[in-house]
Structures are given as structure tokens and as C-alpha cells.
Amino acid sequence: MEPPQKKILKVFDQDGLYKTMVIEPSSTTGEICEKFAKKLFLEDSEVVQFSLFIFEGGVRHQLKNTDFPFDYLIKYEKKDYKFFFLNPNGEFISFDKDKQVKKSQSASTSGSAPPKKEPPKPQELQQKQHISKGKSGWLLRKRPGRYDKLYSVSKADKYLRLYENEDTDNDPLYELSLENSIIELKQDLHLQLTLGNSERYIFTHESESEIVSWAQELQATMNYTPGSSSSGSKTNIIKNSSPMGGMLMGGGGGGGGYIPSTKDLGVKLQSKAENTTTLVSTLIQWVNHILEGKGIKVEETEVLSAFSDGIVFINLIEDLFNQTISYRKGKSVYEMQSNIDKCLDVLKTKCGCDYGKILSSDVSECKVAKIIVRILWSMFVGYFCNCEGKEFNMRDKLISWCSTIVLQESSKQIIVESPSSLRNPMVFAVLVNKFAGSTTLDFNALQKIKSKQDQAQQIIEAAFNYLSIPMVVDSSFWNDDQLDEKSFLIYLSFYYIYLSGQEEEKSKFLQSCINPRPSVEPEQTISIRDKQLKLMREKKEEEDRLKKEKEEKEKEEKEKLEKESSAAAAATSSIASTANSNSTEPPKPTTVPLKKTISKLPPRKLPPTVSSPTTTTTTTVPTTVPTTVTTTTTTTSPTTSPTLTPKQPIGTTIKKPATAPLKLKPVAKPLPQPTPSSSTSTTTTPTTTPSSPKPTPVPRTPQLEKEKQDRLEKARLEKEKAEKEEQEFLKQQQEEEEEEQRLLLEQQKQQQEGQERLRKEEEEQQQQRELEEKQRQIDEEEAEEEARIRELEEEARKSKERLEKARLDKLAKAQKEREDKEREEKEKKEKEERERKERKHDENDMDTFKLLEDIVSSSSSPTITPPQSLHSSQIIRTTIEEDDQTNSELEMFQNEYNRLQDEEEHINSFLKLGSSGSNNSNNNNNNNNNKSGASSVTESVTTNKHKSIDILSDNSSVLSSLDDIINSIDKKTSATTSDSFNLSTSSTSLSFLPSSPDLSTNSTFTTNNNNDDETKARSLTSKARKPLPTLTKEQQSIIDKQTGLVSKQSTNNESNEQQQQQQQQQQLQQQQSSQNSTTSISTVNPSNLSINNEEKEKESEPHKPPPKNTQGRVVVRICLEGFGDVLFCSFAIGYDTLCGTVRDMVIKKMKVSSTEEFEYSLHIVRDGLERVLDDDEILLEAEDKIDRFVFKKNDIDRRLLISNHRPVSSK
């Protein structure tokens, strides 16, 4: 395991002094402040509160206690920055102890001294500092899109309780522990409370002073806690372990550090194990397990596209939350987004899933797997918590259950206190042994396995075989680079649901997921006409059903009334018979107290269809019998029964049973009263009887009285019942009418909505079709445009080829004309030169003959006069000079030949040589032939000179062989001239033409030319000459003397010429060695060769790029890393300079020590990737336009590179 990275943190004061500390990436600002406080104020009696600030570019920035200064050191590595300590008043903390003492003394006198290091005693606390007894009041809690008004209570027990109202006797809605919490007052006057378990609550208040007061109160509540003291004090001050801990922003006066110590923030600073790839795999396996029975399976490689149409979400919602969503099956964007919108709405409103701010377009056009992961994770949390909880509730529930079982079974060997504890696969091994049997897994053998992956593999297989726990996770998830706590929680949830016994319904469902079942079917799309017909049919069926129900109800009511009327008639007849029997036996008059009349509610107002009340006439007739008879006559007008429906035919009457006659107790002697004539009722006429004493009343038995009262009560109840039924019927009828009206309106509204929806759908489909049509047109136009562009490009290419061909033809023609013209001019010049030489040669011959004639003519004289000897010596000198001139001309032709070879090499360097070996051999043969020709010409000239001189020096045969010698000289001179001519013609052909494989025609051409030249030379020299005169001995001796001098000069000239020939041969050998790659020399037709060369160049162009220019130097910039302010250096190098040479140049220039040379190397960076250049690699061949060269150390992190070459900052 690699050691942790470390850096040195320098903190300065205002005087330039600084303190250093070695920090790690996990070191927080609070921890650093705490350690510096121990260093600075360990021996002092008072502690100064301070915070860590960074000054960069004139800007001051305060670091929170949860920030990591290590990140700032990396961020500002190449910038000018400094760290300082500042107190809450914004003053710099000085590292000079004298200044600290002076400052503390001045602060103590002025009353602004910092708090003491030791907490005050309880007795002193009452005098110096006020202890808060708690605070209560209303606070506004910020929620998504709203504020909840809660009654808040803070006491000295480190808890903040939130109630729905001011009644604090009930249980609070929230009970927040302030232990290890973070309290921050933001600039926008929002109080942010972060608990020890990372839960965050945001509060505010309408009053600014009130929210500041709450912040101070919560801080006091967090810092003061009740305790036991022998002195009777109730509270002790707990000093905040952080010396500064951050400042309360907006609180005024810079008071209060509201951050706990770094030890208390261990949970917050703990690195969470998160891996998106692992979580995606786990969630996909979870989804596949749930939807296995429906035949739906999602591949991990298709996460971005499998959920785009929403069908998988719809089936999951139906299985997990029993919420059926109607959807449309299709692949258009409108249908997919419509389905996803429905799913997201149901998840948020009915399932309690908090997936954040995700739109349907984010899912349908998904480009990041985290969007799908967030939705699936929210569905898992909502399903586990029954649509009511949050993620932390689910986490606490699982961890507490697992911790309890593991603690019991493992005897405290394994402790589960957070999701990070699930990184140990032995936790699941304990659960398997607990519920499947203690012998299922060999716990000791598993612990001996070092690989967590191997342990997890055995545990997962055992859980699947013995407990049927789905294998939603893989054993590779326990590797260090694939750990994910959420995946382990999902796997643990199956153990909890299957084995805890608290989630039986979920357990049955998850175990039955593999059973086949139908998936959610999409809604059928029908046409507008079919929808209208369907609505009309439904409307007609509803009307028929209502009509039938109405008829059945009327029929039932009618039968009920008939039964009631028959029962009433039977009751009336029984009452009448009873009354007759009672009248035959008149009872004795007795005094019976009247029963109190039973009160009843006043009759409700009847509808106008009810007839008027009956008319009753009561008469009392005195008779001889001492009884009072009361006759009641009732006249009933025709009425309509209140229970009948309004649609009953008019005129039909239903007879109600007459009420029983009411017998009243006589109060006084009744007087005779005449009955009105208009009355239709029957009356009794009074009869006169003799006066007699007052008769005693007939006593009534209690049974009769009771029966009477029962009858009256029964009649009253029947009447009330009839009235009530009538009112209920009318009310029901009215309600039915209203319901019919409402249904009709709803049907009309639904019909209108359906038509509107159909119209919108048609418009959307029309728009979609228009968009598709436009897109199709655009695609067609683009295709046509591309075809037209291709045609134009093809035409341009063809025209370019035609122009190029015409240009090449024109150049070839011009080249051919130029070559013909040059050849004609050269032939003309050579012909003139040859004629001039022949004329000169003839003149020399004439002079020779003349000299010989003069010698012969002067033979008669005894001696040769000095003028004659001088003249003869001049002739001999002239002959020698001519030979020298011939040699110089041969040398000139050889030089010209060398120059033409150089030009040929320069021209042929751009051509690709087909057969270098054969050409080299031909070239060598031609060079050897040329050398041998030149040497033979030179030797012939020298031999000619020797022969002519020998002839002249020979006394015996001068006259006889002089003619033969002159003829031989002429022949060899002409041969030399012809050889020089052939050499010149062959050289001129090399000036602009390369070699050609057609050598037979060229050789015949040269041989023909040579033969023609030889014949011409022989014709010119074969002229008739005069016979030479004979010489005497005296003349021969004089000539011998002259020729002796000439022979000495000739020997000297011969030695000089031999040296020149040796030098020329050496030069030719050097040229031959340098021309091994050139073509053989041959006289070829210039026009044909020029055309062949152009064709070869065209063929070789696409296969071989033109040679690079390897001459000159270029400037290369090398970037430097680890050399402080020196960022780059430049060098002028050649095209063939090696990377090792450049590396040595950089090492020498930057003065790298010999001990560190092997650590540096030269890198090439391309597109963010880099590689090390080898020392034997050419630098400029590895370069591209987008590359750059970097010189740095190998395999060393840049953040750890502390270079010795970095200049020490004066600051």
C-alpha cells in the first residue's frame, strides 16, 4: 500500500515570520488550527480564537473547518499565495511571543481580552457570564417550495425540539440532537443546522434580530450541558475543543465558533464508498429479479436506452406500489415523454420517491447513467419505507437490525455500526449461519481466506442455495476499487425482508416474482368516429338503465301502498266491531284521569297536490241514558295520495282508513246546537227527557284505554311515516333529476374533452408529420447538395487533370524543341571546329613540305645557316605545340565530361532508379572505355612525336619513310579528332537525359556517327602530296642536332603529361565511386527520354513522398517541469538530431546534478497522452503540429516534486 501523500503548510504572520506543518489530504482546517493552537499557546494562560485565511492576488478567503488546505496547496501551486491566522476581529495573529504578551496585556486593560484557556468555575460563572435557561418561539423551517412554521424549544439538554403548536406536552415532531452539530448563520439570515449524522435543517425568521438570537441560543445550548457538582451548581461550562472553529457570519462582533472538534467530525470526514458502475449493476439485477415473471429483462450495457420509453418504470410501479398507469406503446418522442411524465408524477405524488429535479427529456434522451440510478434508487427507498420514509430511515433500520443479530451471534467479534461495516463479507456470513444453520458455513475457514472476493463468493452462493436470497450483487464488488455501500444495503434488504418476519407481504411478493404474470398492457388507440359511437352507445345504455330502474321503483311503491291500504281497512273493521260490542253493555260512569296528550312535531309543509284537511263536527245529545255519546262525522274530499308519483293519472284516489271515533270526557251538560244545513255530515236530533239526577259516568277499563291510546299512536305514526316517505320520495326524485342532469353535463363535458383531446392529438400528429416531412425534405436537399458537390469536385478534378496533361505536353514539346535546337547548334559548332582544325592541319602540312623542300634545296651548301636552322626548329616546335594543344583539348573534353556527369547526377536525384546494379556496371564499363580511349589518344600522340623525330634523325631512310610517317600522323590525328567528337556528342547527350533501357539503338547510333566521322577525317587527310626531297649527310646531321633539342623538350613534356594523366585518372575514379547510383551513359533520343521521365515521375508521386530537406537548422522549444519559474528552453538543432543529444543539451543548460540525471527524460505529449522518447530516436520525426516536448522526472507526482532549482521566494 502506498504511503499517504504529504505537503508542507507554511502559515505567515504580519511580520514575515512563519510556522510550518506537514499535512495530508485528509487534514481539515479545524485540525490544523487545533494543532497550531497547542504549539502557539501551550504555555500561555489564555487561548486566542483564530481562523485560517488564504491571501491570493489581493483577495482574502476564509477556510471553513471542514475544508482541506491540501487541495488549496495543489490549486494555487503556481500562484502567489500565503496563509495567515486572523482572529475574529480581523487582526493578524503574531508568532512573536513578546508581541503576544503586550497585546494580551493591552487587551486585558481595555476589556477586550480573549477568553481564558481554563473554563471558569461554577461560582464565578454566575458573576461573569449569564447561563441561558432555554428559549422557545416560532421558527420557519425551509422545505422544497415552502416554509413550515414550527414551535421550537431549546433547553440545556443539547436538544432542539420542534412542535406543531405551542402545546409542548405532546410528542415533538422532531427532536434534534445538538451533539457534534454545526451551526452556521448565513449572510441571507438563514440558520443552517448540520447534525452529527449529516442531516441538514435550515431555519429562518421574519425578524433579523430573532434569528441571530436563536443562533446564539443554540450555540449556548451546545456548549453548556447539565452536570453534577459538589457545590450544588447545576451547570458546568464545556469548552469548545476547536480554538476558532469558524466565525458566525452576520452575527456581529465576530463572536462564536460554531464548529466542533475534528475528533467529533470523524463521521463526517469518513470517506464514503461509492461506485456508480457497481450501483448500476446491482440496481439492474434488482429490477430484473422483480420483473422476471413478466418476461422483462434489462441488460447492463443498455441502461441508457432501456428506460427511455417508460415501460420498465410502469411495470415496476405496478409491482412495487400497486399503481396502474395507462400508457401508449410507441417509439416517438411524444409518446415516450408522455409515459415518463406519468411515471415521474406518480412516483413523486403517490409513492413518496424523492428523485430530485429530473425531467422526462433527461430520461428519454439519457446520456448519463446517474439519472437512471437516481430514479431506481428513489424507488427502492420508497418501496422499503412504504412511501413514507427517507433514505436515512431505511439505512438506520437495516443497520440496527443487522447490528443486533451480528452482535448476538459473533460475540462482539464483528461490529456493524454503519454501512461501511458491510465492506466485511463476514457480516453476511453471520446472517447465513443464523437463519440457515450454524453449520452452513465454516466461519473459521472463511476467516482464514485472505481474499474478500473469495469469501463473498462462498457466502453469496450459500445464501442463494439455503435462504433463496437473490444474487443481485457479485463477489467482485468487495474489491477495493468497486466498493459501494448502497449496493450492500440493497443486498442486506433482502435478508431483512426474507428473514426478519416484519415484512411478510414484501417477502411473499419478492419470492413470487419469478412466477409468470402478464405485464401492463398499453391503451388501445381508436379513431375519433369510433370514440363518438362508443360515447353514444354508453349514453343510450345509461338512459335505458335509468328508465328501467324508475319503472321498477314505481311498481314497488304501488304494491306497497296497496298492502298498506288493505291492512288499514282490516284494522278499521276490527275497531268498529269492538266499539259495537262495547256499546251494548254501557259501562258505569267512573272518573278516569285523562292521559296527557303525546306531543308530536308539527306536520311539515306538504306540497300543493295534498288536499285540504277533513272537516269534523261533534254533537252531544242528552238521552235518558246517563251517558254522553259523541258522534264524529268526517267528510273526506277526494285527495291524491302523497306517496304517488307526480306522473300518476289525475283523478285516482286511494282511500285511507277512517280514524277511530274519539270519546271525550263530558265537562258540562251539553246544550243542543243546530247543525248547519250546508253540512254534508249526518247529525243526531236531540230528544227531550224528563229531568233526573246526574248519572254516574261509565267506568272505562284500563285495557280499553290502552287499546285506544295504541290505536291513536299507531295512526299518528302511520301518518308521520306516510308524510316522511312522501318527502323522501320527493327528495329522492329531485336528487335523481339532479343526478341525471349532472351525468348529462358530465357526459357532454367528457365528450367535449374527448373531442378536444382528439383534436389536439390530431394537431400534434399533423405537426409531427409536418416535421417529418420537413426533415425528409431537408435530408433530400442535403443529399442533392452533396451529389452536386461531388459532381462539381469530379468536374474540377477532371479539368485539373486535363490542364495538367496539357501543361505537361506543352513542357515536353518545348523541351524537345529546345533539345533539337541545342543539338543542331552543337553539330554546327563541331562541324566548324572540325573544318578549322583541318584547315590548320593542312597549313601545317604545307609548312612541313615547304620546310623539307627548303632543306633539300639547301643541301648543296656545306652548312645550314642559322636562319634556316631556326626555321626548322620553329617547325618542329610548332608540331610539338600542336600535339600539346591536342592533349589540352582532350583534357578539356574530359573536364566537360566530368561536368556533364555532375549535372546528370543532380537531375537524376529526383528519379527512382529501377535497376541500379545493371546501370552501375554499364557506367563502370563506359568510364573504363573513356579512360582507355583518352589514354590511347595520348599514347598515340606521343608515339607520333617520337616517330616523326626518329624519322628526321635517321640519316639513311629519311627520304624513303618520311611520307609514310606523315600519313600515319594524319591518320592518328584524325582518329583523335573523331574520338573527341564522339566523346563530346556522348557528353552533350548526358547533359539533360537520363538512362534508358533501350541501349541497342543508342549504341548503333553512336557507332554510325563514329564511322561517318572517321570516313570524313580520312577523306580530308588522304590528299595527294608531293614526293619528299632527299637529304645529304650534312643536312641530316644538322637536323639531328635540332631534333636532339626537341627530343629533350618532348621528354619533359611527356613527363608532365603523364602526371596530368595520372591526376585525371584519380579524378575519374573518385567520380566513378560517387556515381554508383546513377544511370549508365548512353546517347538516347532526348524527346523520348523526357516523356518517359515525366511518366515515371507521375507514377512515383503517389507512392513516394518528395525527399525532405535535411539541410539547415530549426529552433525547438522544450517545456520544463520542476524547474521553478523557468518554464521552457529553446535550442537550434538539425533535422537528424537525436533525442539523446537534446536531452544532454537540456541537462547541461539547466545544470542538473549528475546524481539526478538518470531520473529525467524527454517526453512527447499528444492529446493529453505522453510517452518517453528514446535516445536513439530522431527528435523532429516524432514531432507533429499538435505535439509538444516536455523535460521532467519519470513517474513522480507533480505535487510531490520539490525542486532544488526553484528560487526561494523573498516573501
UniProtKB/Swiss-Prot annotation:
Keywords: Coiled coil, Repeat. Induction: Down-regulated by phagocytosis and growth on bacteria. Residues 103-112, 862-877, 1032-1048 have a biased composition (Polar residues). Gene3D superfamilies: Calponin-like domain, Phosphatidylinositol 3-kinase Catalytic Subunit, Chain A, domain 1, Pleckstrin-homology domain (PH domain)/Phosphotyrosine-binding domain (PTB). The keyword Coiled coil applies. One of its GO terms (cellular component) is ruffle. Residues 277-384, 392-502 form the Calponin-homology (CH) domain. Residues 5-90, 1112-1196 form the Ras-associating domain. Residues 132-223 form the PH domain. PROSITE patterns: CH (PS50021), PH_DOMAIN (PS50003), RA (PS50200). This is PH domain-containing protein DDB_G0287875. It comes from Dictyostelium discoideum (Social amoeba).
